[in-house]
Amino acid sequence: MTVEWLAEQLKEHNIELTETQKQQFQTYYRLLVEWNEKMNLTSITDEHDVYLKHFYDSIAPSFYFDFNQPISICDVGAGAGFPSIPLKIMFPQLKVTIVDSLNKRIQFLNHLASELQLQDVSFIHDRAETFGKGVYRESYDVVTARAVARLSVLSELCLPLIKKGGQFVALKSSKGEEELEEAKFAISVLGGNVTETHTFKLPEDAGERQMFIIDKKRQTPKKYPRKPGTPNKTPLLEK
């Protein structure tokens, strides 16, 4: 059973999966595959691959960052809910908001949350650039993003949402260090400071991951984020 494989992997990190959590992951997988037939949620559909490359990969940041506390998390561009929904299953006290620009994905997430009986979750159909200018600006303890865009771009989308004293947890593949070097200027301009870098391998040689923890030291200047599309077209880079 694939969920038992996940339980064994997590046990190595002193994390015990309850029966309820096991059932939630099984339901998550079933709904992901069902909905993926009518909309593009993921290219990964093999059961074991989903448990490894989506579920385990989403939970792995908790080996290095304490999510087991009552904090508010915003997940930018989470797609089918990664990493925040697996983290919510593991740590039910988290208050989770997902922002995604595609309404179909929001519909899936609403159905998923209902079926998993998740409390304190909200899903918002918006561009991160406009969301970061609104009432939720600088209101979250933690913002997560998983390989949505280059780190210089992600920083402009995510750092404005974090309250001073909070953290940006950026999850990248093995080329993350190059992106970090390029993004240092943007991170500084936006009020952040890189405090931790973690590199780890997924089980079964499924690839290397890098995780950056960026502390929000100062308020983000009001002009950021710039209008939709601009961060991607012209990232904040040192001239």
Swiss-Prot record:
InterPro entries membership: rRNA_ssu_MeTfrase_G, SAM-dependent_MTases_sf
GO CC terms of this entry: cytosol
EC numbers for this chain: 2.1.1.-
Residues that coordinate or bind S-adenosyl-L-methionine: G77, F82, A128, E129, R146
SUPFAM superfamilies according to UniProt: S-adenosyl-L-methionine-dependent methyltransferases
Region (Disordered): 214-239
CDD domains associated with the record: AdoMet_MTases
Keywords: Cytoplasm, Methyltransferase, rRNA processing, S-adenosyl-L-methionine, Transferase
Subcellular location: Cytoplasm
Gene Ontology molecular function, alphabetical: rRNA (guanine-N7-)-methyltransferase activity
Disulfide bonds: none
Top-level EC class: transferase
Family the UniProt entry places it in: Belongs to the methyltransferase superfamily. RNA methyltransferase RsmG family.
PANTHER family documented for this protein: S-ADENOSYL-L-METHIONINE-DEPENDENT METHYLTRANSFERASES SUPERFAMILY PROTEIN (PTHR31760:SF0)
Function: Specifically methylates the N7 position of guanine in position 535 of 16S rRNA.
Protein known as: Ribosomal RNA small subunit methyltransferase G
Organism name: Staphylococcus aureus (strain JH9)
Gene behind this protein: rsmG
